[in-house]
């Protein structure tokens, strides 16, 4: 999944999802010697939420969601549940959620649908902007390379959604 911190707010202005005034009015911190990450997080997500509420899903969005369904459904559900529980690790969730009991998951899909849609919107915007940046760089003869982590974080959508691929004990603790 793409990190929403890297979604360019100016692009969201160009898309008509935000205004310059809205972006300028957010306090991201004024001390250049100190980075207030909480302030940045809160301000950025306040703006992303405004953009989301103005966003009208189109065919390109629907295609993105369908094309990425395999990971996006689990990721958006995982993040929505995690956010609704104050960020605690999935291994601390109540058993029906921790062990992915379908009735509990379906209840959360209904309850957290808007939050899941917001997360899908973020991933869509990130992917669009990433592709545009990559194309621009490639046209200038610049190849962008990256690395892929050789491990999966324990507290991740991947570990939660695919426990059969990991060695966990009966309490969902890594062995």
Could you tell me what each predicted segment is?
Residues 171-175:
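Short, intrinsically disordered, charge-balanced linker/junction segments flanking boundaries
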């Amino acid at each position: 999944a793409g990190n929403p911190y890297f979604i360019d707010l100016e692009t969201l202005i160009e898309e008509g999802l935000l205004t310059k005034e809205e972006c300028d009015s957010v306090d991201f911190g004024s001390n250049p010697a100190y980075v207030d990450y909480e302030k940045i997080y809160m301000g950025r997500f306040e703006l992303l939420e405004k953009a989301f509420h103005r966003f009208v899903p189109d065919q390109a969005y629907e295609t993105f969601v369908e094309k990425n369904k395999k990971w996006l459904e689990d990721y958006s559900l995982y993040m929505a549940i995690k956010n609704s529980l104050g960020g605690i690790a999935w291994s601390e969730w109540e058993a029906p959620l921790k062990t992915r009991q379908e009735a509990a998951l379906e209840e959360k899909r209904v309850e957290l649908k808007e939050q899941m849609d917001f997360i899908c919107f973020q991933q869509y915007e990130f992917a669009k902007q990433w592709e545009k940046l990559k194309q621009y760089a490639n046209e200038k003869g610049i190849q962008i390379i990256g690395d892929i982590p050789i491990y999966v974080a324990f507290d991740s959508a991947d570990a939660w959604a695919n426990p059969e691929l990991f060695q966990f004990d009966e309490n969902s603790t890594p062995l």
